[in-house]
Amino acid sequence: MNTGATLIELLAVALGGGTGAAARYVLDTHLKSKHGWAPLWSLAVVNLLGTVVLGLVLGYTSQHLDGAAGSTSAGETQDILYPLLGIGLAGGFTTFSTVMVEVFTRPQPARRIAGVVGMAVVCCAVFLPALWCGALLAGA
C-alpha cells in the first residue's frame, strides 16, 4: 500500500494553494481598502467562504469517488480534485493562522483573551455548520 503523495498530487496542492492564497489576498485587501472592513471581519468572511468551499469539495468528492472506482480515467480525475481544490485551494484561501496573528497583536491583553475565546466560539458555531452546509449543497 502506497501512502505517499504522487508528484501529480503535490503539484495539484501547490497550484491550488497558490491560487487560494492569491484569491485570499485579493479579497481581504479589497474588503479592507475599498469597504473599510476591520481585519478580523474581512478574515472571517474569507474563512467562512473557504469553509463552504471545503464542504462542497468534500461533499462532491465523497459522492463521486465511490462511483468512479470502475473507470480508471474518471477515478484519476476524481482523485486529483481533493488535493487540488480541498487541500490546495481551500487550504490556501482560508487563513485561521492570520486571524490568530491579528488577535495576538492587539494592544490590550484582555482583548487578546476575548479574541481567542471569540474565535473558538465562532469556529464551533459558524464554521462547522458552514462546512456541513457546503457538503449538503454538494449532495453528500
UniProtKB/Swiss-Prot annotation:
Belongs to the fluoride channel Fluc/FEX (TC 1.A.43) family. GO terms for cellular component: plasma membrane. InterPro entries: FluC. It holds the Pfam family CRCB. It is found in: Cell membrane. The chain crosses the membrane at residues 3-23, 38-58, 80-100, 113-133. Keywords: Cell membrane, Ion channel, Ion transport, Membrane, Metal-binding, Sodium, Transmembrane, Transmembrane helix, Transport. This is Fluoride-specific ion channel FluC 1. It comes from Corynebacterium jeikeium (strain K411). Its main location: membrane. GO terms for molecular function: metal ion binding. It catalyses: fluoride(in) = fluoride(out). Na(+) is not transported, but it plays an essential structural role and its presence is essential for fluoride channel function. GO terms for biological process: monoatomic ion transmembrane transport. Na(+) binds at G91, T94. Fluoride-specific ion channel. Important for reducing fluoride concentration in the cell, thus reducing its toxicity. It is a multi-pass membrane protein.
